[in-house]
Amino acid sequence: MGKKHKKHKSDKHLYEEYVEKPLKLVLKVGGNEVTELSTGSSGHDSSLFEDKNDHDKHKDRKRKKRKKGEKQIPGEEKGRKRRRVKEDKKKRDRDRVENEAEKDLQCHAPVRLDLPPEKPLTSSLAKQEEVEQTPLQEALNQLMRQLQRKDPSAFFSFPVTDFIAPGYSMIIKHPMDFSTMKEKIKNNDYQSIEELKDNFKLMCTNAMIYNKPETIYYKAAKKLLHSGMKILSQERIQSLKQSIDFMADLQKTRKQKDGTDTSQSGEDGGCWQREREDSGDAEAHAFKSPSKENKKKDKDMLEDKFKSNNLEREQEQLDRIVKESGGKLTRRLVNSQCEFERRKPDGTTTLGLLHPVDPIVGEPGYCPVRLGMTTGRLQSGVNTLQGFKEDKRNKVTPVLYLNYGPYSSYAPHYDSTFANISKDDSDLIYSTYGEDSDLPSDFSIHEFLATCQDYPYVMADSLLDVLTKGGHSRTLQEMEMSLPEDEGHTRTLDTAKEMEITEVEPPGRLDSSTQDRLIALKAVTNFGVPVEVFDSEEAEIFQKKLDETTRLLRELQEAQNERLSTRPPPNMICLLGPSYREMHLAEQVTNNLKELAQQVTPGDIVSTYGVRKAMGISIPSPVMENNFVDLTEDTEEPKKTDVAECGPGGS
């Protein structure tokens, strides 16, 4: 019985400890009881009372069991049990009173009023603004969201002040940013998408004007302008009109603005809003569900309308420019036979002439323009052409025979590790071409040793003698024996050129026999070589200058070929610059040509037709064939030469 009593003792206050009493709040307005608010729900209250009644019955059962057990408990414990019973009775009476009071309150209380939670003020205002937005504002907001996505760094989100960018207000007179554009959209300041486009251009151009091209702000503005103009293009806007409902209503709302009456403003707002939503759904459904033919027709009509609008705008701009010119520009067509052949569509042309005299460094206007200044440096790739390289698969690699010396009978005789042909094919190649010598080897060695000293030459000659069994030395001796004869012949030619025949008397006083003797003497001294006869000393100097210029041009070509044919190192991006020798030769050629051009008339250098062609004037010239001089062709008439040969008798 003691264990059983202990078990009931632990469950004595179980329900009272874990069940909380509900809190009640009675609201009174004007002295009358209006509503009752409770933290516990009604279903929970009823279940609470039923559970408490069951709990009281359970207490009565426990009390009867205690009374039965008290008969066997001693006197000291009997008083303690009585006190417990009295406390339980008081608590039970108190609970019963509270339950009856709650039942009375529930019976006399009016119907409970559940107050809804307060709606936030901001959400209602935002909904009101969304309802009041026009289709144009919704379209502009949609475009603004697309434009701001192209600015991830938020460079253009807020206005720029002088504190952020010093001197910004002095340079930029009309600042613009995304927040200002949003404010304008909110205030309904934009009447069309073109105004938003103009403000967007202004914002990007301001950033490009204030910042230098090397800065990240300039590059971001340029990139944003490029992507933004694609978003604001007519094709993208047309595609948005076909895909979004409020964009499709843009054209309809513009037409409805002119036909609306002021009397419609007194209608009920809720009904008007409901009717507007229904009509908007119907219009959107009608806009989305036309056939393909209707879509094509609408698209063609819109394209024609845009083309006509663009033509009208261009015409208006031309008229405005003509008016602002003050009579300098006219719209009349010029009737004339002269025109420019290289005329561009915008009316500009170029003059195809090279400036004859280049300005010297230090003079005003000196600015040499090269092709590399317009193209820039090579960013990727190599600066040389790809050279020819034989494919490795085309190379025949025979087997390699091995020789270990004596006592190697059982060692391998050949190595076929890197061979790509069989042993039989290798033997065939060795037997066919094994004893052939390289014929041009001696010439290649001489070319290789062209700039070397005597000792390498002796080594090369001895090597070639061994290979040719003394034939190389015999060939060299024959060549050395033939050299003195050629040298003597060339020396006589040089002395003949250096000799000058002076005339004692003027040519007019000499008779014909004397002139014939002089001509014969010149021919004898030149050993039959034809001699050029010039009309004057100036012509002879002129011809010498031309010969010198020709020689300089050949040397310049050789120097350029030598420089451009060498393979530059792989770490260099640009080509090798001209050497000092090339610069010196080019300067000499320029000075010679300048001196030669100063001694003749312009008609001797270039024809009238060539000058007119360079200027772009197309006037037919009847004497064009006579005036045209082709400097590249050789003259058909041979040079006047006097040759006289002497017989064996000296006659």
From Swiss-Prot:
**Is Phosphoprotein one of the keywords?**
yes
> Which locations, inside or outside the cell, does it occupy?
Nucleus; Chromosome
Please report, in chain numbering, the residue ranges of the motif Nuclear localization signal: 65-96
Q: Which GO terms describe its cellular component?
A: chromatin; cytoplasm; cytosol; kinetochore; nuclear matrix; nucleoplasm; nucleus; RSC-type complex
User: Could you tell me the keywords of this UniProt record?
Assistant: Acetylation, Bromodomain, Cell cycle, Chromosome, Coiled coil, Isopeptide bond, Nucleus, Phosphoprotein, Transcription, Transcription regulation, Tumor suppressor, Ubl conjugation, Wnt signaling pathway
Region entry Disordered, spans: 35-132, 253-301
Q: Which residues carry this modification: Phosphoserine?
A: 279, 289, 380, 482, 621
Compositionally skewed regions (Polar residues) per UniProt: 35-45
A single Gene Ontology biological process assigned to it is: regulation of nucleotide-excision repair
- Location in chain, cross-link Glycyl lysine isopeptide (Lys-Gly) (interchain with G-Cter in SUMO2): 21, 52, 127, 186, 197, 201, 212, 241, 305, 307, 344, 389
Q: Which residues carry this modification: N6-acetyllysine?
A: 328
Q: Which regions are flagged for Basic and acidic residues bias?
A: 47-57, 70-106, 273-301
Coiled coil segments of this chain: 536-567
Task: Give a GO molecular function annotation for the protein.
Answer: transcription corepressor activity
Limits of the Bromo domain = 131-235
Q: Kindly give the InterPro entries that the UniProt entry links to this protein.
A: Bromodomain (IPR001487), Bromodomain-like_sf (IPR036427), Bromodomain_contain_prot (IPR051831), DUF3512 (IPR021900)
Major subcellular site? nucleus
Mark the residues carrying the PTM Phosphothreonine: 514
Where are the compositionally biased (Basic residues) regions? 58-69
- PANTHER family the UniProt entry points to: BROMODOMAIN CONTAINING PROTEIN, BROMODOMAIN-CONTAINING PROTEIN 7
Q: Tell me the function of this protein.
A: Acts both as coactivator and as corepressor. May play a role in chromatin remodeling. Activator of the Wnt signaling pathway in a DVL1-dependent manner by negatively regulating the GSK3B phosphotransferase activity. Induces dephosphorylation of GSK3B at 'Tyr-216'. Down-regulates TRIM24-mediated activation of transcriptional activation by AR. Transcriptional corepressor that down-regulates the expression of target genes. Binds to target promoters, leading to increased histone H3 acetylation at 'Lys-9' (H3K9ac). Binds to the ESR1 promoter. Recruits BRCA1 and POU2F1 to the ESR1 promoter.
The annotated subunit structure for this chain is:
Interacts with TRIM24, PTPN13 and DVL1. Identified in a complex with SMARCA4/BRG1, SMARCC1/BAF155, SMARCE1/BAF57, DPF2/BAF45D and ARID2, subunits of the SWI/SNF-B (PBAF) chromatin remodeling complex. Interacts with IRF2 and HNRPUL1. Interacts (via N-terminus) with TP53. Interacts (via C-terminus) with EP300. Interacts with BRCA1. Interacts (via bromo domain) with histone H3 (via N-terminus) acetylated at 'Lys-14' (H3K14ac). Has low affinity for histone H3 acetylated at 'Lys-9' (H3K9ac).
Descriptive protein name: Bromodomain-containing protein 7
Natural source organism: Homo sapiens
Q: Which gene encodes it?
A: BRD7
